[in-house]
Each structure stands twice: as structure tokens, then as C-alpha cells.
């Protein structure tokens, strides 16, 4: 069995973290405007780089496994794309055109776009324009009615799930002409212009949505809410029939994050200080199986 290792990286809360492709390095934000990159050594985790560019608390980090680029977002309403050149991380400022702080950021599966959630009731979807040599942000606004707390990309590089403090999880199209190829039809729909709402699902008792995740196939969506609920949605391929939804009311404090580890298993964690494993399917429902 794998032995748990505990490492103290900071004496302050970590507001964001992201591992590189082989998990040999981790970027963290110690509740400040700084990004610290630690490398794994036989002696433990050693500080390798300190990245400065933001002027308020960094709220989101993601490390692209193939291009090795880091994207960061902050309460300062901006994002940076960090590229390793020799032994130096070089930042590129991305103007998100937000009037409130960013909350989360994620690279798309093909790493040619990233999405930034915010307190401005906006998701900024950013893509690179070769002609102008800069990152351009397009906004998803409606029907978001509050802070967007979490986002997750569909494997097809086009659909984007968002959890919001307006008690809903939604699936949007983030299709950008000239960047994306037309995705094949899926259970979420066929014609998907930018900003299309492909699904909208409430928490059972009006709880903020804290975390969203697509399954590996992208055919299921899970989200956790502040009403101590976990919901798994299987959309219907037919527009005439309703999606299958499995709602688990938890006898515990709320979860704040969720991720699938296979089509039939997911892990959720939150204020109970222990990750929990759930297993199930569309046909048989879902249940808690064990604690990690």
C-alpha cells in the first residue's frame, strides 16, 4: 500500500495549488500575491522559484501537462500565463476584462484555451491570437447570477461546466471559431455556438455550488453544494426526455471539491477533513463506499 507523506509547505493557508505532469513539482499560492514552485527532492520539497506579477491574492493555478505552461488568476482581476525559458519563468499578462476578482482557472484539455471564473458573474474564456501575439478573452455572462466558484472542461475541449453561488451548476459551450474544430454530437447537444447553455441543474436545497466535474467520457456531470449534497447528472441524448439525476444528501458537513477517478467512481472532499469515495452508475444510483 502507498504510504501517506505529509509536507509543510507554508504556515499560511494555500489558496491555490497545481502539480506539473509527473508530480515532481507543485506551484502553490500561500494566501498572497506570490506563486511558489516547490520541487521534490530526497530531502523533501524545496523552494525552486518565486513568481511575482500579481498584486493581490492568487486564487487559481493550473499547470498544463504537455506545454508545461502555468496559468494563474487573482483577486487583482488579471491572469498570467507563465512560460519556462531556460531557468526563468516568464509571465504574459492576460486582460480578463473583469470588474471583480477571479476565483478559479483551468486549462482546456488541448491546452489551447483556458477559462477563468470570477465574482463578476462572468466566465472569461481565453485563446491565443497568433497575429497579435496576445491572449484574448471572450465572456460567458448569461444566465449567471452570482459568483462562479468552480469550472471544469469537457474532454472535447469545447464544453465547460461551471458551479455558481446562485445554486446552479451549468454546462456551457466555449466553442471559439478558428481555435476549435466542430465537436462530434454528444449527449449535451449538437450545434454549440459560444455561450450556449447545454444544461442547467439546481442543488436540492439552494446551496452554493462549490465544485463541478465531468466524468472521463464527459457523459456525466457531478457537483457538490453547500447544502451538503452531491448530485450526479446523466443528460438525455433526446431533447424530449429529462436527464437522469442522482442526488445524495450527506450526513456530514458540505464538500467543496469533487473529481471522477473513473466512470463509476468519484472522490469528494470538504469540511469533514477526509476525502470520500462514491461509486455507482446511471442505472443503479450512487452511494458512499469508503473514506480515504
Task: Write out the residue ranges for each language-model feature.
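Structural hallmark of WD40 beta-propellers
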Residues: 23-27, 67-71, 80-81, 91, ...
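WD40-repeat beta-propellers
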Residues: 35-40, 79-84, 123-128, 169-174, ...
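Terminal intrinsically disordered, low-complexity extensions flanking WD-repeat/beta-propeller proteins
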Residues: 147, 177-200, 243-292
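Intrinsically disordered, low-complexity acidic/Ser/Thr/Pro-rich linker and tail segments
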Residues: 1-36, 183-197, 292
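Conserved strand-to-loop turn within each blade of WD40 beta-propeller repeats
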Residues: 29-32, 73-76, 117-120, 163-166, ...
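Short C-terminal beta-strands that terminate individual repeats in beta-propeller domains
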Residues: 4-9, 47-53, 73, 91-97, ...
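Solenoidal tandem-repeat scaffolds enriched in leucines and small polar residues
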Residues: 95-185, 194, 211
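Canonical WD40 repeat/beta-propeller blade segments in eukaryotic WD-repeat proteins
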Residues: 11-19, 56-63, 99-107, 145-153, ...
Amino acid at each position: 500500500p502507498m504510504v501517506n507523506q505529509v509536507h509543510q509547505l507554508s504556515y499560511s493557508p494555500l489558496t491555490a495549488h497545481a502539480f506539473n505532469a509527473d508530480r515532481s513539482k507543485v506551484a502553490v499560492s500561500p494566501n498572497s500575491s506570490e506563486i511558489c514552485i516547490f520541487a521534490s527532492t530526497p530531502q523533501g520539497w524545496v523552494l525552486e522559484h518565486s513568481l511575482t506579477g500579481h498584486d493581490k491574492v492568487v486564487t487559481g493555478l493550473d499547470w498544463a501537462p504537455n506545454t508545461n505552461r502555468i496559468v494563474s488568476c487573482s483577486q487583482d482581476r488579471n491572469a498570467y500565463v507563465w512560460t519556462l525559458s531556460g531557468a526563468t519563468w516568464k509571465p504574459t499578462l492576460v486582460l480578463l476584462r473583469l470588474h471583480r476578482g477571479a476565483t478559479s482557472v483551468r486549462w482546456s484539455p488541448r491546452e489551447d484555451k483556458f477559462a477563468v471564473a470570477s465574482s463578476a458573474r462572468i466566465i472569461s474564456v481565453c485563446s491565443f491570437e497568433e497575429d497579435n501575439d496576445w491572449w484574448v478573452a471572450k465572456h460567458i455572462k448569461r444566465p449567471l447570477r452570482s459568483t462562479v466558484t468552480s469550472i471544469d472542461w469537457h474532454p472535447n475541449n469545447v464544453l465547460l461546466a461551471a458551479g455558481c453561488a446562485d445554486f446552479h451548476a451549468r454546462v456551457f459551450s466555449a466553442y471559439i471559431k478558428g481555435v476549435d474544430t466542430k465537436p462530434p454530437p454528444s449527449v449535451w447537444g449538437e450545434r454549440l455556438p459560444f455561450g450556449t447553455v447545454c444544461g442547467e441543474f439546481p442543488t436540492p436545497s439552494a446551496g452554493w455550488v462549490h465544485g463541478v466535474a465531468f466524468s472521463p467520457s464527459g457523459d456525466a456531470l457531478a457537483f457538490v453544494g453547500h447544502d451538503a449534497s452531491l448530485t450526479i447528472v446523466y443528460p438525455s441524448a433526446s431533447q424530449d426526455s429529462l436527464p437522469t439525476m442522482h442526488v445524495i444528501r450527506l450526513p456530514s458537513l458540505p464538500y467543496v471539491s469533487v473529481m471522477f477517478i473513473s466512470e463509476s467512481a468519484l472522490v469528494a472532499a470538504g469540511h469533514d477533513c477526509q476525502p470520500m469515495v462514491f461509486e455507482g452508475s446511471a442505472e443503479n444510483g450512487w452511494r458512499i463506499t469508503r473514506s480515504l
